[in-house]
């Protein structure tokens, strides 16, 4: 059973649409996060992408039964970062546990000390394939042209 995203914000959590980025940054992480922020604030686009994720990520598993697993939004954020940055799971684990802006994008507030374990990332983010990213890219491009 997977939840798209927890709708109840926690104390200290920043709404994803309100995350601020340094406009002078030349690093690639803020650019990726801005793209994810665009997906988040565009409701029609977000719904199409989550429909795709629900179909593609472990389709044989009963979505109404069992433990919740990692939220689809977190799989999307981590999967896009891993594939776009061409990083291994060790670096991804370091980024999602210690990079403040990435943690905000994952829905963690200032007081949330939840961390991600290597194996959890590997098991869940590993379901996010380059082919799935390509399908998402096609949906985003269509939304940009429409």
Segments predicted by a language model, with ranges:
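Charged, often Cys/His-bearing segments associated with DNA-binding zinc-finger transcription factors
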Residues: 1-48
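Basic, short loop/linker segments at the boundary and entry of helix-turn-helix/winged-helix-like folds
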Residues: 34, 38-77
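Catalytic micro-motifs at enzyme active sites that drive phosphoryl/nucleotidyl and oxygen chemistry
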Residues: 64-67, 106-112
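Alpha-helical support elements that line or immediately flank enzyme active sites
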Residues: 76-86
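Helix-turn-helix DNA-binding elements, focusing on the entry/boundary residues of the two helices
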Residues: 89
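DNA-recognition alpha helix
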Residues: 92-105
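Active-site- or DNA-interface-adjacent structural scaffold in DNA-acting proteins
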Residues: 108, 112-146
């Amino acid at each position: 059973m997977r939840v798209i995203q927890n709708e109840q914000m926690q104390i200290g959590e920043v709404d994803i649409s309100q995350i601020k980025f340094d406009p002078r940054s030349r690093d690639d992480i803020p650019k990726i996060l801005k793209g994810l922020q665009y997906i988040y604030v565009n409701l029609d686009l977000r719904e199409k992408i989550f429909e795709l994720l629900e179909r593609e990520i472990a389709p044989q598993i009963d979505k109404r039964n069992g433990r919740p697993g990692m939220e689809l939004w977190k799989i999307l954020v981590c999967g896009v970062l891993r594939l776009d940055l061409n990083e291994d799971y060790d670096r991804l684990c370091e980024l999602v546990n210690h990079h403040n802006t990435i943690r905000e994008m994952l829905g963690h507030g200032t007081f949330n000390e939840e961390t991600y374990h290597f194996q959890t990332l590997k098991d869940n983010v590993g379901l996010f394939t380059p082919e799935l990213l390509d399908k998402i890219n096609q949906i985003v491009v269509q939304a940009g042209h429409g």
